[in-house]
Amino acid sequence: MTPHQTLDFDSCYRAASARDMRFDGRFYTAVTSTGIYCRPICPARTPARRNVRFYRHAAAAEAAGFRPCRRCRPELSPGDPGWDVAADLVGRALRLIDDGVADEYGVAGLAQRLHVTERHLLRLFTARLGAGPLAVARTRRLLLAKQLLTETALPITDVAFAAGFGSVRQFNATMKEAYGFAPSELRTSNGPLAAARRAPAPRAAGHAAPETRHSAGPAADRDAQSTRPGDAQGARPGDAQDARLGDAQGVRLATAAEPPAALTLRLNHRAPYDAATLLGFLAARAIPGMEEASPSGYRRAVTGGSITLTPADGHVKLSVTLDDTRHLAKIVSRCRRLLDLDADPVAIADALGATTLRALVATRPGLRVPGAFDGFELAVRAVVGQQVSVAGARTLLGRIVARAGTPARPTPPGGGIARPTPPTDATERSTPPTDMTTRSTPPADATQWSTPSAGGAGADGPFLLFPTAERLAEADLSGLGLTGRRVATLKALAEKTAAGELDLDAGADPAETAARLMEIPGIGPWTTGYIVMRALRDPDAWPDGDLGLRRAMRALDIAEDDVERWRPWRAYAAMHLWSSE
């Protein structure tokens, strides 16, 4: 099922009846007799066919008057990977909405980023999703708020701003109008304290209550709700105000006397999930002072705090500490892309498993392509990593961050701004220069966080941010071990990005970005392919000319012609080949 296909009722009903995990996030099941919508994997009894409607996107279900199920929790659905394969304008727009562009700049700003008119964007969204971009952004805010209310004890004020609302009043009114209950009511019945109260009363064996789909939760979720009128986008009165967030009044920012907000969220994914290989990849490339990784998890500094990502049963646990919760929505979106949580491993394995990669696919089920937390950061990593080892690139990047990076918080724990001591040139020269993509990862039995001798992380974890394009364009990069040509390439990359001539964000057009990258002296097909693969999330990107890929293909007796047979999953084929070494 691709985003361009019309939903077939019989196919969707069979998938929902079987609770087929492969369709989670690809469509939603709405029930007219209850007025709520579910994921295809909802564990309750399948409703009668006459009462069922299917929608491509949660926003379309909400625009038709349905509320999210409190049992299967649609806010936990992984994203639809079909949009990455299609690589079209709607998919790029969805990624920008996830990053909060519509919240901050409205639909006009979103359309401007995509170089189309608002009318054209609305027409595409309505045709493909059944709801306009404004409605999609609104649903994203509501579902994130629902997850925060259910999983955390974050104050409702902080929940409002973390989800992207401009005020608590707006948050209360929108949730009441869309879902039929106030935020405080949801927390009372479904929040962490309510769950704790319910936990000590298990039902005796043989006395389980019968399940009926959509019957969980209070009466508000059991009563049918009539379809609410909306405009062509499925938007509601007041959505225009929701679409732009100025300086939110009443937002609480952490101060030196008040610790930053700490919370934990579930990030669901489709099984299987090869966390070990992905974390090993990130650990080998962890930049000193900015990030740390081990086989048990990953953490890094972010604006106003830090994040920790830990694999768990069926999901990844995201632990966040932030000065300002308004950054949370973008962080969640970027973490999902970094860990490739929206991929469909079964579909990828079915396609690649029918080729010469059959043995590799069977060896590493659920292999993911590591993404990027920031597009510009990934581009710099790729340029610095040209013709040097992974360890050498990591050393050079650590020096760049130590010189040009900024603290995640104005005053880190302990006072002052302690920067990592850049390694000596001898450290870099001790590692033989080979292709960066072919280096081995840390041993599987390692259990400690990767903490380079360069320092900078300390007991409180990483606290330096990667320099922005504007900052790197002005930074002095001499004396760091970079060649003059490499410095010139980095400066040109930073200047073009800072000037808006080069878009490296998730919503960029891969083909257009690749063409602009190739215009920069010092950036060739390998660097471009690597950036498009990881920063722009193109599942068919191929780092042409990579020595490690050639070596692996020769060792496995795979012909060059086979590369074309791996479409549209060549990025995953590359990861399988790199991992085979």
Q: What is each residue range found by the language model?
A:
Residues 1-223, 229, 244-245, 249-581:
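HhH-family (HhH-GPD) DNA N-glycosylase catalytic core used in base-excision repair
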